[in-house]
Amino acid sequence: MQMMSLRSLVIMFLVVALSAGSVLAKQQFGRPLTLAVVTKVSEIEKNPRDFVGKKVLIRGTVVEVCAKRGCWLDIASDTPYGKFQAKVVDGVIVFPMSARGKVARVEGIVEELKLSREEALAYHRHHAEEKGLPFDPATVKGPETFYRLQAQGAELE
């Protein structure tokens, strides 16, 4: 009888341990992460051209997710009010809205986007529509250049 109780106790312990492990598991998106060293978002923000074309791993809290296709994440910087966008090819990786507020590690290539005024208008109009916000074309003064991470893989902690 005592052997049966011990066996039952061990089985219950294993079930609980395995269940807890699956709940605590990281969510993986896209390719597995290969870099070990995290590059601070603030370093990229400070000198973005130094990082263009380079593979980096960033880490931070997800502050926004594309509501239409889950095709990008905005990752909070390690400095106040800063953020950096991680974009994926539409449909290749789909980030869930539940990623907001979680810590993400995202790996990819830093890219520079140079937009003409017309492209910048279309870009900002599209983002306003995604967020359900009004768009004033007068806010776009001319061509724009910005930087983002072309994400290849990510983990939500």
Please provide the spans of the model-predicted regions.
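N-terminal secretory signal peptides that target proteins for export/translocation
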Residues: M1-L6
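OB-fold and OB-like single-stranded nucleic-acid-recognition modules
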Residues: L24-E157
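Bacterial N-terminal signal peptides
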Residues: L9-A20
